[in-house]
Amino acid sequence: TNDKVKMLIKSKKISPGDIVWADYQYKGRGQYKNTWNSSKGKNLLISVYREFKGLSFKQRNYINFVISLSVIKTIEQYVSNDNFIKWPNDILSGQKKISGILIENNIKGKELRNSIIGIGINVNQTRFRNIPNATSIKLISNNEIEIEQVLKKLIKNIDEHINILIVKDFDQIMNLYNSKLYGRDFCRFLINNEIFQ
C-alpha cells in the first residue's frame, strides 16, 4: 500500500489524510526488506498519507512514536493482553506480534515534507504460515471483528495522537511511548563478552 501511495503522490492524485486500504497483501514490506503475505479480507492493511509542516528531520522519530501509540490504543480496545511497542515498528500482544508499522518519510533539506504511514493489524487471521510468534485480535478475543470498525477507531486514534505532535508536546509523547515500550523494565549489558540483565 505504501508503493501505491507513492504512485498517487507522483501523479498528484492524493491529498494529506487520504488512505489506501488493501483487502490482502502478497508483497508486504517490513524492516530490513522482510516480506509477508496476508490472508484475503482478514486483516487491516492501510497506508496513510500525511504532511507534517514545521517538523524537522531530527523530529521524524516522533511520527513513529505517535503512530505506534495509536495502533496500540486501537488494539487495546479489543484485547486486554499485555500490549507493548517493540522498537522500531512492531506491536506485541501477549509476547506475539499483532501489528507492524512501516513509515517512509520524505525529507527536503532539514524539513520533513510528508510521510507515508503503512500499518498492518492482524484482525481475523488465525493461521500464519511461515510466521512464528504471530497472533491476531480474533485469536486472542475469540471474536470475529469488523475490519472497517477497526479502521475507524485507528484513524480516530491517529488523529488524536497527531494533534499532540502538532502542538509539539514531545514530553507527553515520550511519557506515553515509554510506558508502552517492550523491555523497558530491564537493561542488558555486555561486560567481558558476558551478557548481564
Task: Indicate where each model-derived feature is located.
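General beta-strand structural signal in soluble alpha/beta enzymes
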Residues: A22, N83-W87
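Long, positively charged amphipathic alpha-helical accessory segments at protein N-termini or as interdomain linkers
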Residues: K53-N83, S93-Q197
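N-terminal lobe of the biotin/lipoate ligase/transferase fold
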Residues: T1-Y78, E144
